[in-house]
């Protein structure tokens, strides 16, 4: 054996997975369950109280999802990943960690229509404000930054226009503003794509 780290292809197939100890099956099964068994009431209380790690309810996580998350983290060179049911759910999860009522974020004008609707209408109920910027005019992002700006949101490839966003230039605006840059990478094909 060598001490060589697994490559991208190996990680894509095996990261996060362990052979089943009972059957020896190599592939992670799809766990089609919503709920899990607890050892007793104290065990359940410790799980729901986030004092112990384990499966509680599939909406929160399950063994199949855990393997997906570990695999994505390994492929991206990250510490962890979080799988959610949709892109809109991902937007909510990320922005809920960054924004409070009255805060704002900057978004590129060239976005998927569903995102534009969510940002313009649904997020108002959270008290979040969106400032729109033109991805073809990097200065518009700089001009949109205010003391209430908590994040910048773009798509790597605008949907449906297909225009390529200058991620590096907008990342520099975000760095100068001291806010995270959130990049929706839905339309990119693979890790070797040139964006």
Describe the predicted segments one by one.
Residues 2-62, 70-71:
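N-terminal "arm"/small-domain region of PLP-dependent enzymes with the aminotransferase-like
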Residues 2-4, 12-14, 18-21, 81-195:
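Conserved PLP-enzyme active-site core in the AAT-like
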Residues 40-92, 114-121:
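Conserved N-terminal alpha-helix of the aminotransferase class I/II PLP-enzyme fold
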């Amino acid at each position: 054996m060598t001490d060589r780290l697994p490559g991208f292809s190996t990680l894509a197939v095996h990261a996060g997975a362990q052979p089943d100890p009972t059957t020896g099956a190599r592939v992670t099964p799809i766990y089609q369950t919503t709920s899990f068994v607890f050892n007793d009431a104290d065990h359940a209380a410790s799980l729901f109280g986030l004092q112990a790690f384990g499966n509680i309810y599939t909406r929160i996580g399950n063994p199949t999802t855990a393997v997906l998350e570990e695999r994505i983290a390994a492929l991206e060179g990250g510490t962890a990943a979080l799988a959610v049911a949709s892109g809109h759910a991902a937007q909510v999860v990320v922005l809920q960690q960054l924004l409070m009522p009255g805060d704002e974020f900057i978004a590129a004008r060239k976005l998927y229509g569903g995102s534009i609707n969510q940002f313009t209408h649904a997020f108002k109920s959270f008290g979040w404000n969106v400032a729109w910027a033109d991805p073809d005019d990097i200065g518009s992002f700089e001009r949109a930054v205010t003391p209430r700006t908590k994040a910048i949101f773009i798509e790597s490839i605008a949907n449906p226009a297909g225009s390529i966003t200058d991620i590096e230039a907008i990342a520099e605006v975000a760095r100068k503003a001291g806010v995270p840059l959130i990049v929706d990478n839905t339309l990119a094909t693979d890790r070797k794509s040139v964006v």
